Amino acid sequence: AVEKVRHVGDLVACVAAVDEATAMEALNLFEVEYEVLEPVFDPKKGLEDADEPIHWRGKYHLARTNVQKRVFQEFGDRSLVETPLASSHGKWNMAGVHHGFTEPHAVVAHWDPNGRLQLYTPQQVPHYTHRALATVLDVPMHQINVIRTFVGGGFGGKSDPFPHEMCAAILARKSGRPVRITFDREEVYWINRGRHPSHIEVKMTADEEARISGFDIDALIDGGGFASFGHVTSYYNGVLATAPYELGSFHYTGARVWTNKPASGAMRGHGAVNTRCAVEVGLDEMSEQMKVDPIDLRLANLLPPH
């Protein structure tokens, strides 16, 4: 954290020592003074103007809210939804989920005699990490090797360049010795990057021929304290909601909001699982109204082969 801590567990300082006990003793010598700000824990509150937004992006900021990203998607003929034979309207509150991978975050960094950084990390996105290291360290990319070790479980949770990787590289450069950082389970949860907690509203209609005439979806997703994969998650909640179905019309509004929690990110079925769940339940409800088999309803509305 620089100037502002975004959530409990946000990294403030890093210490290297000959062993963990010495490092912990050194950490206890730190004294940090905090000015307590009004926290934002509810993404709905994040839509409102704030005296102190969690992040401030100058001319690119959306008013004084904590909205990171808004997305609007639409196609088709909206008049098709006006006289439906069947309809469904559902509101969903989805909890956040962590990946629960077996291996915690870990990294080893050292600088060889030629001044090249060798960084070993169980990353899912080693190229992202490579670029981030070059920027943070102000070192050309050709002087950095990122070695992707065997990933002991990831499921999307190791898909960011992480601060502890930057810290290991900096501490190794300062000390002239290899540096290893291994998280305990609590520290893994503070880093998070799990599935977004979401508030989702889905309206859908079908006509007298059992054709899906429209999806109308709104998704408010809780991004936590940092962006991570949030930009694309905001899109995926819309574009992946259509699945393999041919729709008469489609309307989607989405917003990702910063809150004072560990950051949400990518997790299996990234950006699709929550809205897809809501959509499929809605299709089941419409099949009951029309007294048709739910599988037949889906088969009748599949996109044609290309």
Residue ranges of model-derived segments:
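Short, well-ordered strand-loop elements centered on a beta-strand within folded domains, enriched
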Residues: 115-122, 209-219, 256-257
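Short beta-strand elements
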Residues: 106-111, 199-208, 214-219, 245, ...
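General beta-strand structural signal in soluble alpha/beta enzymes
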Residues: 7, 88-92, 119-121, 143-148, ...
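Extended, polar/acidic
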Residues: 1-132, 230, 235-249, 260, ...
